[in-house]
Amino acid sequence: MAKELSGYGPTAGESMGGTGANLNQQGGNNNSNSGVHWGGGSGHGNNGGQGNSNSSGSTSTVMKTGESYLTPWGDVVINNDGLPVMNGIVMTEENSTLVDNPFGGVSRVLNSLISDMPSLFAESSGNNNNNTASVNTAPTNAQVSDMDKSSKVVSNVINEKQKQKNKIATQISEKQKKIEEMKKVFKHHSYHGITDLERDVDELQKKSNQLDADISKLNSYKNTLQSKIGDVNKQKEAEEKARENAEVAEHETLNEEKQAVAEAEKRLAEAKAELAKAESDVQSKQATVSRVAGELENAQKSVDVKVTGFPGWRDVQKKLQRQLEAKQAEYSAVENELKNAVSFRDGKAAEVKEAEQKLKEAQDALEKSQIKDAVDTMVGFYQYITEQYGEKYAKIAQDLAEKSKGKKIQGVDEALAAFEKYKNVLDKKFSKVDRDAIFNALESVNYDELSKNLTKISKSLKITSRVSFLYDVGSDFKNAIETGNWRPLFVTLEKSAVDVGVAKIVALMFSFIVGVPLGFWGIAIVTGIVSSYIGDDELSKLNELLGI
């Protein structure tokens, strides 16, 4: 069994990909000389690539050219040939040895350093495979929390060695005092009692000097850890700032496009209102033209019917003619007004069409950005899975998402039976501490953030999701972790997916991966739940990856 502590701290093995998820070994198995065994975690990992492992819980990771990890005796860098280099020297079976380090792990170290500082080491690990760089060492980008834990462990080791040094100093002082007392009694200084004490003092002084060297080396290692913690914190701050800036820019872009849609909708509403008003004006003027046309027709008839033979008939005829001409002028005027109103109405109709086109363009732009945002979310999700748990795990997650599209939901009993079989083996792999950590993470869920993730992931899968189901799923998930009864969660998932299918379950459960720090085993449970709805093939892949 690989020891728990690595180059950075008690949990540093777990920092290399969530308790060993991305840990793998290339070429062959652990009992051969063909593998490249760079480092191990705390017993949760498995081996992948082209080989397999017969080790009892040890984990390993393939490190890339140029990567390095930290040991108490300096950095180990992987050269272009994939070999470990310390102090500029390629470590081989002849010039280096795997030894227990002071913190409970195992490291490959140059023999010259072992001879220089023997008291830092326990005994050899018994495995000096020249392809083995180190066991239980963490890469330099290990999490700050792990490095901080290791720094505290180093401090404890330093304190312990200082206590040993103080004890030795007391012993030296006591023996020197006895020597002085004996010299007063025995003038012949070659008296064997004196020489024995002097020899003891010399041996104790050598141990004290060695402890000084150890303490100096450990202080240097501690300072290096603290420096790296600062560097990692700065890098994390810079990355977080860049991420925040990107999110702000993306948010601003979406806000601008949402604003553009809102403005286009407002303009369309205004244009339609103006068109309605113009249409009403046209109808009013049409009624006026119709009325004046009737009056003009009557006036024309009055003129056409000439009645003569009474006094003043000529004056009457002239008056009727003037009335006709007035109506003709009025008709011409209202007819022109109608033409203008119709032209104005047609212009407003054109404005409505233009506003509708502008709205469509704004909506298309917003839709495109939202889709891009959703795609970016999934790309970021797979990248996160890759960084935390490895490419194989990310590939499984991607396969689950793709295979869920269009897949109808199966019965609760069938999916639950598949999951229970998987979970029964999984339960043996993680402890109550792991289970409590998952429960606590689910206790502190930010459902506002989770709902945003659900919306984006759902959009990328081209489905719609009700945010309300998140609360039910989160509650049932938490209760299942606490009680071991998973049926209520599967019932809730089936209810949520009855209209859309398995893609809804993927969206819901992946939202928890993105938004909740579930840890490696929490993610293993989530992907196991989703896989149980997809099929045995996906569960088999997951089992193989987890080594169960």
UniProtKB/Swiss-Prot annotation:
Subcellular location: Host membrane
Biased composition, class Gly residues, residue ranges: 37-51
Cellular-component GO terms for this entry: host cell membrane; membrane
UniProt keyword terms in alphabetical order: Antibiotic, Antimicrobial, Bacteriocin, Host membrane, Membrane, Plasmid, Transmembrane, Transmembrane helix
GO terms classed as biological process: defense response to Gram-negative bacterium; killing of cells of another organism
InterPro entries: Channel_colicin_C (IPR000293), Channel_colicin_C_sf (IPR038283), ColA_N (IPR055023)
Top-level taxon of origin: Bacteria
Residue spans of biased composition, Low complexity class: 21-36, 52-61
MF annotations from Gene Ontology: pore-forming activity
Listed transmembrane segments: 505-525
Region listing for Disordered, in residue ranges: 1-63
Functional note: This colicin is a channel-forming colicin. This class of transmembrane toxins depolarize the cytoplasmic membrane, leading to dissipation of cellular energy.
Family statement drawn from the similarity comment of this UniProt entry: Belongs to the channel forming colicin family.
Descriptive protein name: Colicin-K
Originating gene: cka
